[in-house]
């Protein structure tokens, strides 16, 4: 895979001796995986389970297969499955998935809620919100409301309401380069900083929707520190937050200057990229 020169230089500086293995990992095939839907099926079992996950398996499921069409399984990349697993809501919670389409994290959050509590799955894009609705309906989650709003408009309605907010933020998408090579066309040295400005705007609205004692889980599918550790540090500096350490499993490594956070690289883990 051919990378922009600025990308290579950046990750040689960040990863040092690991940079060669990191860049070489992009020549491998993207990893496919899926989850069993515990709301519908508890008897299905497959080989090649993703370690340390309750419902995840490596492998590809056809969109035309009976298991997919009936919502018994949901296709989701392995690293992406870690976000809702870190969030892990308990039944009865009021949960917001703020950038939810196409529905991977929302279906997983709904699995943890097990029909008890409320999940608001929001997607600002009208087109993508329709896909989100289809996936949530197929999954069979009954305690979910799908909204098609900006974070700013939601914040006017849900001030101090949610026990848990998950934001898998719009980002530069570096972690998806292997799966979606076209995403590299949008990348530039300045692009992560541009994304970070939007991320701060969304987070400022998210903070107002958290109930007292609530939790905010922030994630991206990129490795750019501008969009990850620097955003977390901005939250800590700007608001009354306490950073909860993440258990580093499945090849996770500590974040840059924030060891409580976690990074996932394809040369450490059988999956794509995630923060």
Regions found by a protein language model. Give the residues of each.
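S-adenosylmethionine
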Residues: 1-275
């Amino acid at each position: 895979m051919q990378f922009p020169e600025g990308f290579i230089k950046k990750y040689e500086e960040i990863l040092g001796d690991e940079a060669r293995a990191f860049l070489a990992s992009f020549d491998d095939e993207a990893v496919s995986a899926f989850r069993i839907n515990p709301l519908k099926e508890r008897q299905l079992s497959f080989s090649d389970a993703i370690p340390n996950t309750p419902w995840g398996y490596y492998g590809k499921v056809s969109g035309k297969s009976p298991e997919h069409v009936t919502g018994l399984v949901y296709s989701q990349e392995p690293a992406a499955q870690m976000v809702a697993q870190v969030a892990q809501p308990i039944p009865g919670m009021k949960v917001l998935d703020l950038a939810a389409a196409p529905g991977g994290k929302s279906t997983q959050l709904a699995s943890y809620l097990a029909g008890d509590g409320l999940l608001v799955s929001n997607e600002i894009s009208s087109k993508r919100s329709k896909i989100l609705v289809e996936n949530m309906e197929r999954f069979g989650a009954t305690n979910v409301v799908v909204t098609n709003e900006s974070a700013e408009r939601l914040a006017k309605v849900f001030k101090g309401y949610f026990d848990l907010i998950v934001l898998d933020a719009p980002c530069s998408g570096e972690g998806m380069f292997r799966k979606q090579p076209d995403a590299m066309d949008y990348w530039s040295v300045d692009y992560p900083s541009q994304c970070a400005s939007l991320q701060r705007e969304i987070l400022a609205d998210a903070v107002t929707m958290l109930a007292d004692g609530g939790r905010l889980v922030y994630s991206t599918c990129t490795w750019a520190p501008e969009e990850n550790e620097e955003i977390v540090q901005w939250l800590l500096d700007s608001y009354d937050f306490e950073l909860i350490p993440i258990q580093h499993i499945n090849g996770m490594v500590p974040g840059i200057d924030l060891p409580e956070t976690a990074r996932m690289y394809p040369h450490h883990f059988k999956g794509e990229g995630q923060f």
